[in-house]
Amino acid sequence: MLALRSFFYLLLKFPLKLLVRCKIITDSQNITDQPNQPIFYIVRHQSASDLLALQSACKKQNLPDPLGKVTINGESFNRTLCLAKSTPLCSWRKSSKTTATAQGLALLNQHVIDENIDAKLIPANLIWGRTPTKERKNLNIGTLLADQESPNWLRKFFIVLFLGRDTLVRFSEAFSLRNISDNHGSDEAAAHKFLRVARFHFHRQTIAAKGPRLMHRKQMFTALFANPSVKRIISDEAKNKKVSEAEIKKKALVMMNEIAGDYSVSWLRFGEIILHWLWKRLYSAIKVSNAKVLRKLAQDGHEIIYVPCHRSHMDYLLLSYVILQEGLVMPRIAAGINLNFWPAGTIFRKGGAFFIRRSFGGNRLYSTIFREYLGLLFERGYGVKYYTEGGRSRTGRVLAPKTGMLAMTIQSLLRGIDRPLTLVPVYLGYEHVMEVGTYHKELSGSEKKGESMFGVLKAIKSLRNYGNGYVNFGEPMNINEFLNKQVPDWKDSIDPIDPQKPSWLTPTVNVLADQVMENINKSAALNGVALIALILHASKNKALSKLELETQLDFFLNIQRQAPFSEQLTIPEETGAELLTHVISLNKVTITEDSFGSLVSLSETANTEMRYYRNNILHTYVVPALVCRLLDKHSKINQDELVIKVQNVTALLKEDLYLYQDSTHVEQQTLRVLTVLKEMEIAKQTKAGFWSLSDDVGLLSQVHAMAECIDESLQRLAIITSLTSRLAPLSKRDLETKVVAIAKRLSVLNNINAPEFIDKRAQSTLIATIREQGYIDLDDDGLLIASSTMAEIKATVINLVDIEVLQSIAR
């Protein structure tokens, strides 16, 4: 019998090799670290195609052969436990049970007999295709392939034939049979229990990869028209405009067609193939961080809402591709209506996009339909992705969040959704953004051009090596838990019929939106282009010798490796020299040779474009830069005083740069930075606790470069604190106008070509933060005046700014 099975598997291997292509995702780490301990697998189906596909995947992962045998204390065991046999083709025949329970019991008993055994059991889930089940009763090829629960051999033949090249093999974290035996017993009940847990585990995992039942557009429209809120708004609109409800329904249907996506798995599969081909030609690598947490969320039944930063139109494609590659279902994506042009609009809809207008413009019918459509997506269990910034950042810094989508998300929760809603901030980083040149023109006053097919073709024509792409999944934010802390009685506002807008909604959403942006920044990705942009913009003439730039890169990297901005920050493993070589290959810098060696500089065009990449990571160096500036400006400074000054200035920049750090985090990073500087012999500390810089001129240049990174922010603070102290009382509007005027003057004098430096909204944010920190008060007439603590913070700031800047402000 064994020989016959082996011969059968041998016959199947060749056709399966042609028909099956496995995408492997593993959560199991360091399984082979204990080579003397036996390894077993558990799978859903006792199927030859499943086992042979698993064998191929295990070979690629250097894992033991699942078709092999394991001998424990002289007793032989199959390495793979199968939970269910295939359903018989004839309905009157009953499916026999597998030996999984008996083998599980025998394995647990071996752990009772021999205390030295600690066998590992790896759940291996094989998912053929990513087609979710559909809400339709008629049998067709789609439903035939979608239903994979214990398929008979004929159904499995078609599944392998049509879906074999889109097979996902998911290795979960191995669990210890020793732990089960010691804590749950080794009887038949214990064996049944862990097999039951495995079945549930596979079910949740499959839902996470394929998604819930697919609802078609017409079904969604029917559900929306049956929604009480939509019914009410149609009735109200008909009465107010004195037309028939049928006419309003026609308008509503047009809006639904404009909004709704048209999700197609076949389109997604085709798009994934195209994108895989494209990324291989565009990017050296796509680096993904923290995806394991994401998979666990999906498997635990969370409603995942992706909230990425928005750098480029490429974001839509890159993040969607990565989500699919990580074995998760494609979310429904909120896209701007400007992307709904032929043929991109149709393609995006098939990929799961739904479209949103830039402004609802007081259109109650549209806003109601859109809100209820979003709520329906959540209710049906579909993941969603939207950009809280509302549009692409033109400066490289994250933008102030638009809160509309977040508000509608919480309103959906107030309809009584059972599953937890969890926001996943996503940091998207690039070493080349194809729109950067266009962004600079728009910031310089050029009119923004609308999207079109011509623009897409033009962009494709200019495709070249874009370096690396980065997708960092941030710390998940459970909205239910957030509301429990912010509004303990929020559940009192739940109403499954009428959409609620309680008084606490707006302020709570504002807090949540800020936390989202902070968590995006918390998960930043450092890269060679951004680091070189940061360092060269901190140099006097935007130029350094090649050797000096490599040294600076190593210093900047070392600071983050030993005193990181956050645990989520990703840092390149390469040396400074390796990063510079890579950036030179991307043509981002100009190399000039002279008798002394090579000079690295920025051309006039690159100077403005590289500022974009500098701004991507500037926030990660705020604390190290402030520490270096304080040491640079003081011959000696007490440690406690230094920490307080860093805390005070960082608090003023928190809203402007969306820093997640509170005073405790700032203190911890400050002390770590000081320790690193001491270990590098750049700074020294006396027994009395005073810090000062070393006398080594070569080392001091590194400190100067780091300190210069924060200079523009300090200049803006100096302008505001000086003008408030000197000109108060004055209105907020007058202060903003005067601050912008001086900022423009300084930008000319110091050659600061930075739109954010003179942006009125950015100055307004800084003024608001300074007021929130208690340095600005209001007089009886509602005008701004300096508070009693203004003098202290003003002194701190102006002592960190060059005298030439202060003279310009004083004039």
From Swiss-Prot:
Keywords, alphabetical: Acyltransferase, Cell inner membrane, Cell membrane, Lipid biosynthesis, Lipid metabolism, Membrane, Phospholipid biosynthesis, Phospholipid metabolism, Transferase
Gene Ontology CC annotations of this record: plasma membrane
Location(s), subcellular: Cell inner membrane
GO biological process: CDP-diacylglycerol biosynthetic process; fatty acid metabolic process
Motif placement: HXXXXD motif: 309-314
Membrane topology, record value: Peripheral membrane protein
Family the entry assigns: Belongs to the GPAT/DAPAT family.
NCBIfam families membership: plsB, PRK04974.1
Name of this chain's protein: Glycerol-3-phosphate acyltransferase
Species for this entry: Colwellia psychrerythraea (strain 34H / ATCC BAA-681)
